[in-house]
């Protein structure tokens, strides 16, 4: 009853948002605005909606593949939720230089999981790329990966990958702020490859894939593969890997927490209680103590996402509290059940490997 009047109020803002997006895109398409091109190939991984579609795991997959080819890789991410501003070096490809508080949880996680990659946080991806070009002038990267950059057209890219979630009816979605669309759906035709992820209903996924083929772009399906629970300390390993069904209090501050719970249950974890927070929301000592107290009272083990664990790692006190509590986090990765070789070939062609 309350949602419809609010939707009506927000609709004019959505129309204005869409108009501004279209004007901006037209300026680039008519060459009135020219994107800056760095000296190395660029891959952009983004989406057309606000919220989680699985961009970060896909950036991780792409980075690992380029590294396996022997490439020197640089990642540029906005660094959502960080306390710093401007261009920040998160990793120089040898050392992790910033915590999640300074770099953003996703950016810090990408850097820690890919220690050989250069990782930079920058709201303006072009400024981040110029910083990399200047800093690593004598040993430049072979390829730059832009995280969440489909709408960041100031920087040219050689391969535009867009991820679409099959778990939300985005074809019926409206523009921000009424809905979750960042720009009109017809702009998916600007992508080079469309990845369809978060598939729960195969029939619905077939219908979405059929609709996406109208863009004339290849559509490949992805899935989240659950690797299992990782204890945050060696002393919590026994509780996480005894083979006995884990009874858990799950907590997360991500865009799609229900999918986290579903992935947890696929590991055999018995989720008895859960607590959700806003995406990228900083944890406080009070919140963490409350979670630990509730888990202890109910006789449950604390389980969270890897992204949330990196956010907690950024604060030494919160890290210590969770280590003593025997917390574990869920480790996941992106896989492409079909079409993986097609994507690999596109990436290899880009770097001439």
From Swiss-Prot:
<dbReference type="Pfam" id="PF02606">
    <property type="entry name" value="LpxK"/>
</dbReference>
<keyword id="KW-0067">ATP-binding</keyword>
<protein>
    <recommendedName>
        <fullName>Tetraacyldisaccharide 4'-kinase</fullName>
        <ecNumber>2.7.1.130</ecNumber>
    </recommendedName>
</protein>
<keyword id="KW-0441">Lipid A biosynthesis</keyword>
<keyword id="KW-0443">Lipid metabolism</keyword>
<keyword id="KW-0808">Transferase</keyword>
<dbReference type="InterPro" id="IPR003758">
    <property type="entry name" value="LpxK"/>
</dbReference>
<dbReference type="GO" id="GO:0009244">
    <property type="term" value="P:lipopolysaccharide core region biosynthetic process"/>
</dbReference>
<dbReference type="GO" id="GO:0009245">
    <property type="term" value="P:lipid A biosynthetic process"/>
</dbReference>
<keyword id="KW-0547">Nucleotide-binding</keyword>
<feature type="binding site">
    <location>
        <begin position="49"/>
        <end position="56"/>
    </location>
    <ligand>
        <name>ATP</name>
    </ligand>
</feature>
<dbReference type="GO" id="GO:0005524">
    <property type="term" value="F:ATP binding"/>
</dbReference>
<dbReference type="GO" id="GO:0005886">
    <property type="term" value="C:plasma membrane"/>
</dbReference>
<dbReference type="InterPro" id="IPR027417">
    <property type="entry name" value="P-loop_NTPase"/>
</dbReference>
<comment type="pathway">
    <text>Glycolipid biosynthesis; lipid IV(A) biosynthesis; lipid IV(A) from (3R)-3-hydroxytetradecanoyl-[acyl-carrier-protein] and UDP-N-acetyl-alpha-D-glucosamine: step 6/6.</text>
</comment>
<keyword id="KW-0418">Kinase</keyword>
<dbReference type="GO" id="GO:0009029">
    <property type="term" value="F:tetraacyldisaccharide 4'-kinase activity"/>
</dbReference>
<comment type="function">
    <text>Transfers the gamma-phosphate of ATP to the 4'-position of a tetraacyldisaccharide 1-phosphate intermediate (termed DS-1-P) to form tetraacyldisaccharide 1,4'-bis-phosphate (lipid IVA).</text>
</comment>
<comment type="similarity">
    <text>Belongs to the LpxK family.</text>
</comment>
<keyword id="KW-0444">Lipid biosynthesis</keyword>
């Amino acid at each position: 009853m309350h949602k419809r009047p609010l939707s009506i109020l927000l609709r004019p803002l959505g129309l204005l948002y869409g108009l501004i997006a279209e004007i901006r895109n037209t300026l680039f398409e008519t060459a009135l605005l020219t994107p800056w091109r760095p000296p190395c190939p660029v891959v952009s991984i983004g989406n057309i909606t606000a919220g989680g579609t699985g961009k970060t795991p896909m950036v991780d997959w792409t980075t690992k593949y380029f590294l396996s080819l022997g490439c020197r890789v640089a990642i540029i991410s906005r660094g959502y939720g960080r306390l710093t501003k401007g261009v920040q070096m998160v990793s120089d490809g040898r050392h992790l230089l910033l915590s999640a508080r300074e770099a953003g949880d996703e950016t810090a996680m990408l850097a820690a999981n890919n220690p050989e990659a250069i990782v930079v946080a920058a709201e303006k991806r072009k400024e981040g790329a110029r910083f990399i070009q200047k800093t690593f002038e004598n040993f430049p990267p072979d390829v730059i990966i832009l995280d969440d950059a489909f709408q960041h057209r100031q920087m040219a890219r050689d391969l535009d990958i867009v991820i679409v979630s099959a778990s939300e009816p985005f074809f019926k979605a409206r523009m921000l702020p009424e809905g979750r669309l960042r720009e009109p759906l017809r702009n998916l035709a600007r992508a080079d490859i469309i990845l369809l992820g978060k598939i729960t209903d195969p029939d619905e996924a077939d219908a979405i894939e059929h609709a996406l083929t109208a863009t004339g772009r290849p559509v490949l399906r992805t899935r989240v593969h659950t690797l299992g629970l990782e204890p945050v300390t060696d002393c919590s390993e026994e509780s996480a890997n005894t083979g006995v069904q884990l009874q858990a209090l799950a907590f997360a501050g991500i865009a799609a927490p229900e999918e986290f719970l579903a992935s947890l249950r696929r590991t055999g974890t018995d989720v008895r209680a859960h607590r959700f927070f806003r995406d990228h929301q900083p944890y406080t000592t009070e919140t963490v103590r409350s979670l630990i107290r509730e888990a202890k009272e109910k006789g449950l083990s604390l389980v969270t996402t890897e992204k949330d664990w990196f956010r907690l790692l950024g604060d030494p006190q919160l890290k210590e509290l969770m280590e003593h509590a025997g917390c574990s986090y869920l480790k996941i990765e992106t896989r492409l059940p079909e079409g993986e070789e097609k994507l690999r070939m596109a990436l290899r062609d880009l770097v001439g490997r």
